[in-house]
Protein backbone atom coordinates (compact mmCIF):
# COMPACT_ATOMS: atom_id res chain seq x y z
CA UNK A 1 0.00 0.00 0.00
CA UNK A 2 1.28 3.46 -0.91
CA UNK A 3 0.87 6.68 1.05
CA UNK A 4 0.54 10.22 -0.23
CA UNK A 5 3.35 12.67 0.49
CA UNK A 6 1.28 14.53 3.10
CA UNK A 7 0.50 11.26 4.89
CA UNK A 8 4.15 10.23 4.80
CA UNK A 9 5.23 13.54 6.29
CA UNK A 10 2.60 13.19 8.99
CA UNK A 11 4.32 9.96 10.01
CA UNK A 12 7.77 11.54 9.82
CA UNK A 13 6.71 14.26 12.25
CA UNK A 14 5.54 11.60 14.71
CA UNK A 15 9.12 10.31 14.76
CA UNK A 16 10.61 13.82 15.23
CA UNK A 17 12.01 13.88 11.71
CA UNK A 18 12.21 17.46 10.34
CA UNK A 19 9.85 18.36 7.49
CA UNK A 20 8.73 21.76 6.13
CA UNK A 21 5.57 23.32 7.52
CA UNK A 22 2.66 22.30 5.31
CA UNK A 23 -1.10 21.82 5.11
CA UNK A 24 -3.19 19.52 2.92
CA UNK A 25 -6.18 21.21 1.27
CA UNK A 26 -9.15 20.16 -0.82
CA UNK A 27 -10.27 23.50 -2.34
CA UNK A 28 -8.71 26.86 -3.33
CA UNK A 29 -10.15 28.84 -0.40
CA UNK A 30 -8.68 26.38 2.08
CA UNK A 31 -5.31 26.87 0.38
CA UNK A 32 -5.37 30.58 1.22
CA UNK A 33 -6.13 29.79 4.85
CA UNK A 34 -3.34 27.21 4.87
CA UNK A 35 -0.86 29.75 3.49
CA UNK A 36 -1.77 32.22 6.23
CA UNK A 37 -1.22 29.52 8.84
CA UNK A 38 2.14 28.48 7.36
CA UNK A 39 3.35 32.07 6.96
CA UNK A 40 5.71 33.62 4.46
CA UNK A 41 5.05 35.16 1.06
CA UNK A 42 5.90 32.22 -1.22
CA UNK A 43 4.68 28.63 -1.14
CA UNK A 44 5.07 25.36 -2.99
CA UNK A 45 1.90 23.71 -4.32
CA UNK A 46 2.13 19.93 -4.74
CA UNK A 47 -0.42 17.64 -6.37
CA UNK A 48 -0.91 14.52 -4.26
CA UNK A 49 -0.75 11.40 -6.41
CA UNK A 50 0.84 7.98 -6.03
CA UNK A 51 3.46 8.58 -8.72
CA UNK A 52 6.87 10.12 -9.13
CA UNK A 53 7.85 12.71 -11.71
CA UNK A 54 5.26 15.27 -10.55
CA UNK A 55 7.56 18.24 -11.05
CA UNK A 56 8.25 17.58 -14.73
CA UNK A 57 4.54 16.91 -15.29
CA UNK A 58 3.50 20.28 -13.83
CA UNK A 59 2.25 18.85 -10.55
CA UNK A 60 4.62 20.91 -8.37
CA UNK A 61 4.44 24.71 -8.65
CA UNK A 62 6.07 27.64 -6.89
CA UNK A 63 3.63 30.49 -6.21
CA UNK A 64 4.58 34.02 -5.16
CA UNK A 65 1.27 35.38 -3.86
CA UNK A 66 -2.16 34.20 -2.75
CA UNK A 67 -3.75 34.89 -6.14
CA UNK A 68 -1.25 32.59 -7.81
CA UNK A 69 -1.85 30.09 -5.01
CA UNK A 70 -5.61 29.96 -5.59
CA UNK A 71 -5.13 29.74 -9.33
CA UNK A 72 -2.61 26.88 -9.06
CA UNK A 73 -4.76 24.88 -6.65
CA UNK A 74 -7.85 25.40 -8.80
CA UNK A 75 -5.96 24.22 -11.90
CA UNK A 76 -4.56 21.10 -10.25
CA UNK A 77 -7.57 19.88 -8.28
CA UNK A 78 -9.70 17.46 -10.27
CA UNK A 79 -7.19 16.95 -13.07
CA UNK A 80 -5.54 13.64 -13.92
CA UNK A 81 -1.78 14.03 -13.67
CA UNK A 82 0.21 12.04 -16.22
CA UNK A 83 3.83 11.31 -15.31
CA UNK A 84 6.44 8.80 -16.47
CA UNK A 85 5.20 6.46 -13.72
CA UNK A 86 1.50 6.50 -14.68
CA UNK A 87 -0.41 5.16 -17.66
CA UNK A 88 -1.86 7.48 -20.30
CA UNK A 89 -4.93 8.15 -18.11
CA UNK A 90 -2.82 9.50 -15.25
CA UNK A 91 -3.77 9.70 -11.58
CA UNK A 92 -6.61 11.84 -10.18
CA UNK A 93 -5.60 14.85 -8.07
CA UNK A 94 -7.98 15.08 -5.11
CA UNK A 95 -5.69 16.76 -2.55
CA UNK A 96 -3.08 19.49 -2.69
CA UNK A 97 -0.19 19.99 -0.28
CA UNK A 98 0.62 23.64 0.39
CA UNK A 99 4.14 23.87 1.79
CA UNK A 100 6.56 26.56 2.93
CA UNK A 101 9.54 27.16 0.66
CA UNK A 102 13.02 26.02 1.66
CA UNK A 103 16.40 27.65 1.11
CA UNK A 104 18.11 24.73 -0.60
CA UNK A 105 21.91 24.65 -0.55
CA UNK A 106 22.36 20.95 -1.33
CA UNK A 107 20.15 17.98 -2.22
CA UNK A 108 20.81 14.43 -1.02
CA UNK A 109 19.02 11.10 -1.33
CA UNK A 110 18.18 8.85 1.61
CA UNK A 111 16.18 5.63 1.44
CA UNK A 112 15.55 2.23 2.97
CA UNK A 113 14.28 -0.98 1.44
CA UNK A 114 14.02 -4.68 2.29
CA UNK A 115 16.73 -6.48 0.33
CA UNK A 116 15.24 -9.84 -0.66
CA UNK A 117 18.66 -11.38 -1.30
CA UNK A 118 20.09 -10.72 2.17
CA UNK A 119 16.64 -10.70 3.85
CA UNK A 120 17.63 -7.53 5.69
CA UNK A 121 16.83 -3.84 5.68
CA UNK A 122 19.30 -1.82 3.62
CA UNK A 123 19.74 1.95 4.00
CA UNK A 124 20.96 3.87 0.97
CA UNK A 125 22.31 7.39 0.59
CA UNK A 126 23.56 9.39 -2.37
CA UNK A 127 24.81 12.83 -3.25
CA UNK A 128 22.50 12.68 -6.28
CA UNK A 129 19.36 13.94 -4.55
CA UNK A 130 16.35 15.29 -6.40
CA UNK A 131 16.60 12.85 -9.33
CA UNK A 132 15.23 9.35 -9.87
CA UNK A 133 17.45 6.98 -7.89
CA UNK A 134 16.86 4.29 -10.54
CA UNK A 135 18.73 6.44 -13.07
CA UNK A 136 21.60 6.92 -10.63
CA UNK A 137 21.76 3.16 -10.00
CA UNK A 138 21.87 2.53 -13.74
CA UNK A 139 24.39 5.18 -14.76
CA UNK A 140 26.50 5.75 -11.62
CA UNK A 141 25.99 2.90 -9.13
CA UNK A 142 29.16 3.89 -7.29
CA UNK A 143 27.37 7.05 -6.12
CA UNK A 144 24.93 5.03 -4.00
CA UNK A 145 26.17 4.23 -0.50
CA UNK A 146 24.65 1.28 1.36
CA UNK A 147 24.60 -0.11 4.89
CA UNK A 148 22.92 -3.39 5.79
CA UNK A 149 21.09 -3.67 9.10
CA UNK A 150 21.68 -6.73 11.28
CA UNK A 151 18.18 -7.62 12.56
CA UNK A 152 19.65 -9.00 15.79
CA UNK A 153 20.97 -5.60 16.93
CA UNK A 154 19.23 -3.10 14.64
CA UNK A 155 20.66 -0.05 12.95
CA UNK A 156 23.66 1.36 14.83
CA UNK A 157 24.74 5.04 15.05
CA UNK A 158 28.15 4.24 13.58
CA UNK A 159 26.40 3.06 10.39
CA UNK A 160 24.65 6.43 10.15
CA UNK A 161 28.02 8.14 10.49
CA UNK A 162 29.40 5.92 7.72
CA UNK A 163 26.71 7.23 5.39
CA UNK A 164 27.23 10.81 6.56
CA UNK A 165 30.97 10.89 5.91
CA UNK A 166 30.50 8.87 2.71
CA UNK A 167 28.37 11.76 1.41
CA UNK A 168 31.34 14.07 1.90
CA UNK A 169 29.78 15.89 4.85
CA UNK A 170 31.92 17.14 7.75
CA UNK A 171 29.93 19.42 10.06
CA UNK A 172 29.52 17.77 13.48
CA UNK A 173 26.16 19.44 14.18
CA UNK A 174 24.86 18.14 10.86
CA UNK A 175 26.27 14.70 11.71
CA UNK A 176 24.18 14.55 14.89
CA UNK A 177 21.09 15.73 13.00
CA UNK A 178 21.71 13.22 10.19
CA UNK A 179 22.14 10.38 12.69
CA UNK A 180 18.91 11.33 14.47
CA UNK A 181 17.05 11.39 11.14
CA UNK A 182 18.34 8.00 9.97
CA UNK A 183 17.72 6.36 13.35
CA UNK A 184 14.20 7.82 13.36
CA UNK A 185 13.58 6.49 9.86
CA UNK A 186 14.72 3.04 11.00
CA UNK A 187 12.24 3.07 13.89
CA UNK A 188 9.50 4.19 11.50
CA UNK A 189 10.43 1.48 9.00
CA UNK A 190 10.34 -1.36 11.52
CA UNK A 191 7.47 -0.23 13.75
CA UNK A 192 5.13 0.53 10.83
CA UNK A 193 5.99 -2.51 8.66
CA UNK A 194 7.28 -0.54 5.69
CA UNK A 195 8.66 -2.14 2.55
CA UNK A 196 10.08 1.07 1.04
CA UNK A 197 10.98 4.49 2.40
CA UNK A 198 12.50 7.31 0.35
CA UNK A 199 13.49 10.85 1.29
CA UNK A 200 14.26 12.51 -2.02
CA UNK A 201 15.52 15.04 -1.57
CA UNK A 202 16.93 15.36 1.91
CA UNK A 203 18.10 18.96 1.72
CA UNK A 204 20.72 20.97 3.54
CA UNK A 205 19.43 24.52 3.84
CA UNK A 206 21.45 27.71 3.57
CA UNK A 207 21.62 27.83 7.37
CA UNK A 208 22.94 24.25 7.54
CA UNK A 209 19.76 22.49 8.67
CA UNK A 210 18.65 19.11 7.33
CA UNK A 211 15.02 18.86 6.16
CA UNK A 212 13.08 16.06 4.45
CA UNK A 213 11.64 17.89 1.48
CA UNK A 214 9.78 14.93 -0.04
CA UNK A 215 8.83 11.51 1.27
CA UNK A 216 7.62 8.27 -0.27
CA UNK A 217 6.36 5.36 1.83
CA UNK A 218 5.19 1.90 0.82
CA UNK A 219 3.67 -0.41 3.43
CA UNK A 220 3.75 -4.20 3.38
CA UNK A 221 0.19 -5.24 2.48
CA UNK A 222 0.59 -8.45 4.47
CA UNK A 223 1.09 -6.41 7.67
CA UNK A 224 -1.92 -4.10 7.30
CA UNK A 225 -3.98 -6.24 9.67
CA UNK A 226 -1.85 -4.90 12.53
CA UNK A 227 -1.46 -1.34 11.21
CA UNK A 228 -4.98 -0.02 11.67
CA UNK A 229 -3.95 3.65 11.54
CA UNK A 230 -2.16 3.19 8.24
CA UNK A 231 -4.94 1.02 6.84
CA UNK A 232 -7.30 4.00 7.20
CA UNK A 233 -4.97 6.08 5.01
CA UNK A 234 -5.54 3.94 1.92
CA UNK A 235 -6.64 5.97 -1.12
CA UNK A 236 -8.31 3.56 -3.54
CA UNK A 237 -8.79 6.33 -6.13
CA UNK A 238 -5.06 6.03 -6.82
CA UNK A 239 -5.23 2.28 -7.40
CA UNK A 240 -6.32 0.21 -10.38
CA UNK A 241 -10.02 -0.60 -9.84
CA UNK A 242 -9.47 -4.19 -10.94
CA UNK A 243 -6.72 -4.67 -8.36
CA UNK A 244 -8.87 -3.08 -5.65
CA UNK A 245 -11.73 -5.46 -6.47
CA UNK A 246 -9.33 -8.41 -6.42
CA UNK A 247 -8.04 -7.49 -2.97
CA UNK A 248 -11.57 -7.65 -1.59
CA UNK A 249 -11.70 -11.32 -2.61
CA UNK A 250 -8.09 -12.04 -1.61
CA UNK A 251 -7.10 -12.53 -5.23
CA UNK A 252 -3.61 -11.55 -6.38
CA UNK A 253 -4.22 -9.56 -9.57
CA UNK A 254 -1.94 -7.36 -11.64
CA UNK A 255 -3.14 -5.81 -14.90
CA UNK A 256 -0.89 -6.10 -17.95
CA UNK A 257 -1.10 -4.87 -21.54
CA UNK A 258 -1.97 -8.07 -23.44
CA UNK A 259 -5.28 -9.61 -24.55
CA UNK A 260 -5.21 -13.11 -23.00
CA UNK A 261 -6.70 -13.25 -19.53
CA UNK A 262 -5.09 -15.69 -17.09
CA UNK A 263 -6.57 -17.44 -14.05
CA UNK A 264 -4.19 -19.73 -12.19
CA UNK A 265 -3.81 -21.17 -8.70
CA UNK A 266 -0.33 -20.51 -7.38
CA UNK A 267 2.03 -17.61 -8.11
CA UNK A 268 4.77 -19.79 -9.59
CA UNK A 269 2.36 -21.57 -11.93
CA UNK A 270 0.86 -18.20 -12.86
CA UNK A 271 4.25 -16.83 -13.91
CA UNK A 272 5.04 -20.02 -15.85
CA UNK A 273 1.65 -19.72 -17.59
CA UNK A 274 2.38 -16.15 -18.64
CA UNK A 275 5.80 -17.23 -19.94
CA UNK A 276 4.28 -20.05 -21.99
CA UNK A 277 1.62 -17.74 -23.46
CA UNK A 278 4.38 -15.37 -24.51
CA UNK A 279 6.47 -18.23 -25.90
CA UNK A 280 3.45 -19.37 -27.94
CA UNK A 281 3.09 -15.95 -29.53
CA UNK A 282 0.46 -14.39 -27.27
CA UNK A 283 0.40 -11.59 -24.71
CA UNK A 284 -1.02 -12.05 -21.18
CA UNK A 285 -3.53 -9.43 -20.08
CA UNK A 286 -2.98 -10.02 -16.39
CA UNK A 287 -1.43 -11.97 -13.57
CA UNK A 288 -4.17 -13.55 -11.46
CA UNK A 289 -3.54 -16.06 -8.68
CA UNK A 290 -6.76 -17.39 -7.13
CA UNK A 291 -4.78 -19.09 -4.37
CA UNK A 292 -4.92 -22.61 -3.04
CA UNK A 293 -8.68 -22.71 -2.46
CA UNK A 294 -10.25 -22.03 -5.86
CA UNK A 295 -13.87 -21.94 -4.67
CA UNK A 296 -16.82 -21.29 -6.97
CA UNK A 297 -17.27 -17.80 -5.52
CA UNK A 298 -13.63 -16.82 -5.99
CA UNK A 299 -13.52 -18.27 -9.50
CA UNK A 300 -16.66 -16.29 -10.38
CA UNK A 301 -15.19 -13.05 -9.06
CA UNK A 302 -11.93 -13.78 -10.86
CA UNK A 303 -13.81 -14.14 -14.15
CA UNK A 304 -15.64 -10.86 -13.50
CA UNK A 305 -12.35 -9.05 -12.93
CA UNK A 306 -10.73 -10.53 -16.04
CA UNK A 307 -13.62 -9.71 -18.42
CA UNK A 308 -13.93 -6.18 -17.02
CA UNK A 309 -10.73 -5.52 -18.96
CA UNK A 310 -12.04 -4.68 -22.45
CA UNK A 311 -8.74 -5.74 -24.03
CA UNK A 312 -9.31 -9.40 -23.10
CA UNK A 313 -10.12 -11.55 -26.16
CA UNK A 314 -9.70 -14.96 -24.53
CA UNK A 315 -9.10 -16.56 -21.14
CA UNK A 316 -6.72 -19.34 -20.10
CA UNK A 317 -7.56 -21.14 -16.84
CA UNK A 318 -4.66 -23.25 -15.53
CA UNK A 319 -5.48 -25.13 -12.32
CA UNK A 320 -3.48 -27.76 -10.48
CA UNK A 321 -5.81 -29.78 -8.27
CA UNK A 322 -4.14 -30.86 -5.06
CA UNK A 323 -6.37 -30.78 -2.02
CA UNK A 324 -9.15 -29.31 -4.17
CA UNK A 325 -10.57 -31.84 -6.65
CA UNK A 326 -10.47 -30.88 -10.34
CA UNK A 327 -14.07 -32.00 -10.93
CA UNK A 328 -15.27 -29.54 -8.29
CA UNK A 329 -13.14 -26.82 -9.89
CA UNK A 330 -14.72 -27.67 -13.26
CA UNK A 331 -18.18 -27.26 -11.71
CA UNK A 332 -17.12 -23.86 -10.42
CA UNK A 333 -15.76 -22.80 -13.81
CA UNK A 334 -18.94 -23.87 -15.65
CA UNK A 335 -21.13 -22.11 -13.11
CA UNK A 336 -18.98 -18.97 -13.23
CA UNK A 337 -18.99 -18.82 -17.04
CA UNK A 338 -22.80 -19.08 -17.01
CA UNK A 339 -23.22 -16.44 -14.31
CA UNK A 340 -20.78 -13.91 -15.73
CA UNK A 341 -21.94 -14.41 -19.32
CA UNK A 342 -18.52 -14.74 -20.90
CA UNK A 343 -18.54 -14.33 -24.68
CA UNK A 344 -14.83 -14.92 -25.34
CA UNK A 345 -13.21 -18.36 -25.70
CA UNK A 346 -12.10 -20.03 -22.49
CA UNK A 347 -9.37 -22.68 -22.51
CA UNK A 348 -9.01 -24.75 -19.33
CA UNK A 349 -6.12 -26.97 -18.35
CA UNK A 350 -6.75 -29.15 -15.29
CA UNK A 351 -4.06 -31.33 -13.73
CA UNK A 352 -4.03 -33.40 -10.57
CA UNK A 353 -6.81 -34.83 -8.41
CA UNK A 354 -9.75 -36.01 -10.62
CA UNK A 355 -8.39 -34.09 -13.64
CA UNK A 356 -9.92 -36.46 -16.21
CA UNK A 357 -13.36 -36.21 -14.65
CA UNK A 358 -13.05 -32.42 -14.57
CA UNK A 359 -12.05 -32.31 -18.25
CA UNK A 360 -15.05 -34.48 -19.15
CA UNK A 361 -17.43 -32.15 -17.33
CA UNK A 362 -16.02 -29.20 -19.25
CA UNK A 363 -16.33 -31.03 -22.58
CA UNK A 364 -19.94 -32.05 -21.83
CA UNK A 365 -21.01 -28.59 -20.63
CA UNK A 366 -22.04 -27.43 -24.11
CA UNK A 367 -20.40 -24.08 -23.46
CA UNK A 368 -17.56 -22.28 -25.19
CA UNK A 369 -15.03 -23.98 -22.92
CA UNK A 370 -12.10 -25.87 -24.44
CA UNK A 371 -10.48 -28.58 -22.31
CA UNK A 372 -6.74 -28.59 -23.06
CA UNK A 373 -4.71 -31.81 -23.16
CA UNK A 374 -1.69 -30.33 -21.40
CA UNK A 375 0.14 -27.17 -20.38
CA UNK A 376 1.70 -26.41 -23.77
CA UNK A 377 -1.52 -27.34 -25.56
CA UNK A 378 -3.47 -24.91 -23.37
CA UNK A 379 -1.19 -22.00 -24.28
CA UNK A 380 -1.24 -22.89 -27.98
CA UNK A 381 -5.04 -23.28 -27.98
CA UNK A 382 -5.76 -19.89 -26.40
CA UNK A 383 -3.27 -18.09 -28.66
CA UNK A 384 -4.92 -19.77 -31.66
CA UNK A 385 -8.43 -18.82 -30.50
CA UNK A 386 -7.46 -15.20 -29.86
CA UNK A 387 -5.72 -15.08 -33.25
CA UNK A 388 -8.92 -16.20 -34.96
CA UNK A 389 -10.87 -13.42 -33.22
CA UNK A 390 -8.26 -10.81 -34.11
Curated annotation (Swiss-Prot):
<dbReference type="InterPro" id="IPR013815">
    <property type="entry name" value="ATP_grasp_subdomain_1"/>
</dbReference>
<feature type="binding site">
    <location>
        <position position="265"/>
    </location>
    <ligand>
        <name>substrate</name>
    </ligand>
</feature>
<dbReference type="InterPro" id="IPR016102">
    <property type="entry name" value="Succinyl-CoA_synth-like"/>
</dbReference>
<dbReference type="GO" id="GO:0004776">
    <property type="term" value="F:succinate-CoA ligase (GDP-forming) activity"/>
</dbReference>
<feature type="binding site">
    <location>
        <begin position="53"/>
        <end position="55"/>
    </location>
    <ligand>
        <name>ATP</name>
    </ligand>
</feature>
<protein>
    <recommendedName>
        <fullName>Succinate--CoA ligase [ADP-forming] subunit beta</fullName>
        <ecNumber>6.2.1.5</ecNumber>
    </recommendedName>
</protein>
<feature type="binding site">
    <location>
        <position position="46"/>
    </location>
    <ligand>
        <name>ATP</name>
    </ligand>
</feature>
<comment type="pathway">
    <text>Carbohydrate metabolism; tricarboxylic acid cycle; succinate from succinyl-CoA (ligase route): step 1/1.</text>
</comment>
<dbReference type="Pfam" id="PF00549">
    <property type="entry name" value="Ligase_CoA"/>
</dbReference>
<keyword id="KW-0436">Ligase</keyword>
<dbReference type="GO" id="GO:0042709">
    <property type="term" value="C:succinate-CoA ligase complex"/>
</dbReference>
<comment type="similarity">
    <text>Belongs to the succinate/malate CoA ligase beta subunit family.</text>
</comment>
<comment type="function">
    <text>Succinyl-CoA synthetase functions in the citric acid cycle (TCA), coupling the hydrolysis of succinyl-CoA to the synthesis of either ATP or GTP and thus represents the only step of substrate-level phosphorylation in the TCA. The beta subunit provides nucleotide specificity of the enzyme and binds the substrate succinate, while the binding sites for coenzyme A and phosphate are found in the alpha subunit.</text>
</comment>
<keyword id="KW-0460">Magnesium</keyword>
<dbReference type="InterPro" id="IPR005811">
    <property type="entry name" value="SUCC_ACL_C"/>
</dbReference>
<dbReference type="GO" id="GO:0006099">
    <property type="term" value="P:tricarboxylic acid cycle"/>
</dbReference>
<keyword id="KW-0479">Metal-binding</keyword>
<comment type="subunit">
    <text>Heterotetramer of two alpha and two beta subunits.</text>
</comment>
<dbReference type="GO" id="GO:0005829">
    <property type="term" value="C:cytosol"/>
</dbReference>
<feature type="domain" description="ATP-grasp">
    <location>
        <begin position="9"/>
        <end position="245"/>
    </location>
</feature>
<feature type="binding site">
    <location>
        <position position="99"/>
    </location>
    <ligand>
        <name>ATP</name>
    </ligand>
</feature>
<feature type="binding site">
    <location>
        <position position="107"/>
    </location>
    <ligand>
        <name>ATP</name>
    </ligand>
</feature>
<dbReference type="InterPro" id="IPR013650">
    <property type="entry name" value="ATP-grasp_succ-CoA_synth-type"/>
</dbReference>
<dbReference type="GO" id="GO:0006104">
    <property type="term" value="P:succinyl-CoA metabolic process"/>
</dbReference>
<feature type="binding site">
    <location>
        <position position="102"/>
    </location>
    <ligand>
        <name>ATP</name>
    </ligand>
</feature>
<dbReference type="InterPro" id="IPR005809">
    <property type="entry name" value="Succ_CoA_ligase-like_bsu"/>
</dbReference>
<dbReference type="GO" id="GO:0005524">
    <property type="term" value="F:ATP binding"/>
</dbReference>
<dbReference type="GO" id="GO:0004775">
    <property type="term" value="F:succinate-CoA ligase (ADP-forming) activity"/>
</dbReference>
<dbReference type="Pfam" id="PF08442">
    <property type="entry name" value="ATP-grasp_2"/>
</dbReference>
<dbReference type="InterPro" id="IPR017866">
    <property type="entry name" value="Succ-CoA_synthase_bsu_CS"/>
</dbReference>
<feature type="binding site">
    <location>
        <begin position="322"/>
        <end position="324"/>
    </location>
    <ligand>
        <name>substrate</name>
    </ligand>
</feature>
<feature type="binding site">
    <location>
        <position position="214"/>
    </location>
    <ligand>
        <name>Mg(2+)</name>
    </ligand>
</feature>
<keyword id="KW-0816">Tricarboxylic acid cycle</keyword>
<dbReference type="GO" id="GO:0000287">
    <property type="term" value="F:magnesium ion binding"/>
</dbReference>
<keyword id="KW-0067">ATP-binding</keyword>
<keyword id="KW-0547">Nucleotide-binding</keyword>
<dbReference type="InterPro" id="IPR011761">
    <property type="entry name" value="ATP-grasp"/>
</dbReference>
<feature type="binding site">
    <location>
        <position position="200"/>
    </location>
    <ligand>
        <name>Mg(2+)</name>
    </ligand>
</feature>
Amino acid sequence: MNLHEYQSKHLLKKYNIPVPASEVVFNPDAAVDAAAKIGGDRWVVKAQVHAGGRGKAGGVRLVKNKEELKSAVKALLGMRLVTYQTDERGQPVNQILVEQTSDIARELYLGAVIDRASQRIVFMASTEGGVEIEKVAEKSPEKILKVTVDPAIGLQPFQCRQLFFGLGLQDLKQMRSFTDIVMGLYRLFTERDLSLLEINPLVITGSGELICLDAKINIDDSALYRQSELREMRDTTQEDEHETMAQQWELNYIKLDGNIGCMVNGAGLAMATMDLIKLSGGDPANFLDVGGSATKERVTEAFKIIVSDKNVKGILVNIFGGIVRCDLIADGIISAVKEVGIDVPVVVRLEGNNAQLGAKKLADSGMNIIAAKGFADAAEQIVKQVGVIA
